[in-house]
């Protein structure tokens, strides 16, 4: 039961951090204005596309980690039983 509670708390903390990152971003600056320079342009994280990109990046990294875990375990198991 405590494992579920711990997972729920960590999910809550990560969602709070995500909310802070998304909604505490600086106000948008017109990227094409002459006063804006590309090296000083601030990335805004409260648009739909940036949130969608972050979610997709998170899912991609999780799926990559799961695949590598499976692949490494499969290789380890086949190498281990090869001697028997």
Swiss-Prot record:
It is found in: Virion membrane; Host membrane; Host Golgi apparatus, Host trans-Golgi network. It comes from the Viruses. The chain crosses the membrane at residues 48-68. Residues 1-26 form the signal peptide. Residues 69-84 are intravirion. One of its GO terms (cellular component) is host cell Golgi apparatus. It holds the Pfam family Herpes_UL73. It is a single-pass type I membrane protein. Residues 27-47 are virion surface. The keyword Ribosomal protein does not apply. Keywords: Disulfide bond, Host Golgi apparatus, Host membrane, Membrane, Signal, Transmembrane, Transmembrane helix, Viral envelope protein, Virion. Envelope glycoprotein necessary for proper maturation of gM and modulation of its membrane fusion activity. Also plays a critical role in virion morphogenesis. Interacts (via N-terminus) with gM (via N-terminus). The gM-gN heterodimer forms the gCII complex. HAMAP family: HSV_GN. Belongs to the herpesviridae glycoprotein N family. This is Envelope glycoprotein N. The gene is gN.
């Amino acid at each position: 039961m405590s494992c579920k509670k711990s997972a729920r708390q960590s999910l809550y903390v990560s969602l709070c951090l995500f909310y802070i990152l998304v909604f505490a971003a600086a106000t948008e600056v017109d990227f094409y204005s002459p006063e804006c320079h590309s090296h000083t342009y601030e990335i805004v994280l409260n648009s739909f596309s940036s949130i969608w990109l972050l979610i997709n990046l998170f899912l991609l990294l999780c799926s990559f980690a799961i695949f590598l875990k499976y692949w490494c375990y499969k290789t380890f198991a086949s190498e281990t039983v090869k001697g028997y």
